[in-house]
């Protein structure tokens, strides 16, 4: 388990992280979210030992996080850091050896990953010769080649088309199922919803939402209603329980104050026309983020 115990990081008078407490169990994906400047990257860098901790402590399986256990951690940063003039094979084997992996094992493991991502033909090409998407695959391999126990992923699907996003998702899920603990950050809330059971949303270095995603959604109160109809539904706008109204190509999407309002809206629709779809939904993570942080995630 990764334990972040009342961690604070200051830069002069500025608190980038303020008394953060997190427990991330083994074999689980944990989402760490927040707008720009919320403290995510600072937290990642303290876990990696790249930044000192002002107050508190961080431990992995009961041992303080420091240089001696850094080989057990993999990190895919948002800012890419590959050597553009270096060949793929030479670069990845070199990085794995820096993490304590034997060359023979690194070469064997590299072959497995290149084949998995359908990029075996690029083994002896320079990184700068690859497309942005394939560079992202190489960057991902660099974070996992040494078989880390803890993996930190910051925007791992950036620059990938939908097919390759699914390919990387499958790899991430496979790593989790093999026992790797994963700390995950992304501005694509649908990816976080799909992959993470637990999460924390930071604002100004402090958690504003924390816990199991299902429980967070359940306790949020507000619900969404999707209605598909070709009829004029604007008469529903008079209902005080409707908080947001958004017209779509198929009808309308509403945010309502609570679940009971949906029954009242459904009753109002009776005899008013043909309704192809009426669906009550939990709030999305995007809805919760906007409500709690008050900004669009960028």
Curated annotation (Swiss-Prot):
PROSITE patterns (UniProt xref): ABC_TRANSPORTER_1, ABC_TRANSPORTER_2
InterPro entries per the UniProt record, alphabetical: AAA+_ATPase (IPR003593), ABC_transporter-like_ATP-bd (IPR003439), ABC_transporter-like_CS (IPR017871), ABC_transporter_ATP-binding (IPR050763), DrrA1-3-like_C (IPR025302), P-loop_NTPase (IPR027417)
Residues that, per the record, bind ATP: 34-41
Keyword set, alphabetical order: ATP-binding, Cell membrane, Membrane, Nucleotide-binding, Transport
Subcellular locations according to the entry: Cell membrane
One Gene Ontology molecular-function label: ATP binding
Residue stretches making up the ABC transporter domain: 2-229
PANTHER family, per the entry: ABC TRANSPORTER ATP-BINDING PROTEIN (PTHR42711), ABC TRANSPORTER ATP-BINDING PROTEIN NATA (PTHR42711:SF5)
This protein's name: Uncharacterized ABC transporter ATP-binding protein YhaQ
Gene coding for it: yhaQ
């Amino acid at each position: 388990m990764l334990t972040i115990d009342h961690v604070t990081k200051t830069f002069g008078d500025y608190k980038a992280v303020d008394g953060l407490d997190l427990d991330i169990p083994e074999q689980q994906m944990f989402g760490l979210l927040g707008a720009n400047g919320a403290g995510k990257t600072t937290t990642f860098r303290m876990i990696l030992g790249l930044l000192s901790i002002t107050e508190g402590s961080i431990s992995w399986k009961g041992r303080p996080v420091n240089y001696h256990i850094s080989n057990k951690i993999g990190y895919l940063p948002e800012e890419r850091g590959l050597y553009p003039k270096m060949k793929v094979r030479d670069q990845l084997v070199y990085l794995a050896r820096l993490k304590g992996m034997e060359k023979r094992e690194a070469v064997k493991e590299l072959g497995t990953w290149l084949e998995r991502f359908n990029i075996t033909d690029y083994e002896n090409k320079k990184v700068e010769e690859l497309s942005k998407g394939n560079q992202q695959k190489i960057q991902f391999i660099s974070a996992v080649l040494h078989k880390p126990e803890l993996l930190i992923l910051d925007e791992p699907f950036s620059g990938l088309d939908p097919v390759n996003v699914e390919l990387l998702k499958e790899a991430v899920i496979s790593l989790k199922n093999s026992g790797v603990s994963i700390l995950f950050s992304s501005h694509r809330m649908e990816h976080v919803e799909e992959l993470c059971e637990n999460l924390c949303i930071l604002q100004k270095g402090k958690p504003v939402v924390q816990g199991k995603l299902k429980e967070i959604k359940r306790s949020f109160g507000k619900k969404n209603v999707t209605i598909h109809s070709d009829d004029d539904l604007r008469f529903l706008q008079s209902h005080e329980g409707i908080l947001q109204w958004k017209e779509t190509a198929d009808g309308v999407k509403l945010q309502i104050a609570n679940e009971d309002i949906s029954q009242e809206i459904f009753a109002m629709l009776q005899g008013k026309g043909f309704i192809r779809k009426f669906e009550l939904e939990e709030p999305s993570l995007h809805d919760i983020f906007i409500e709690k942080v008050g900004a669009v995630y960028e």
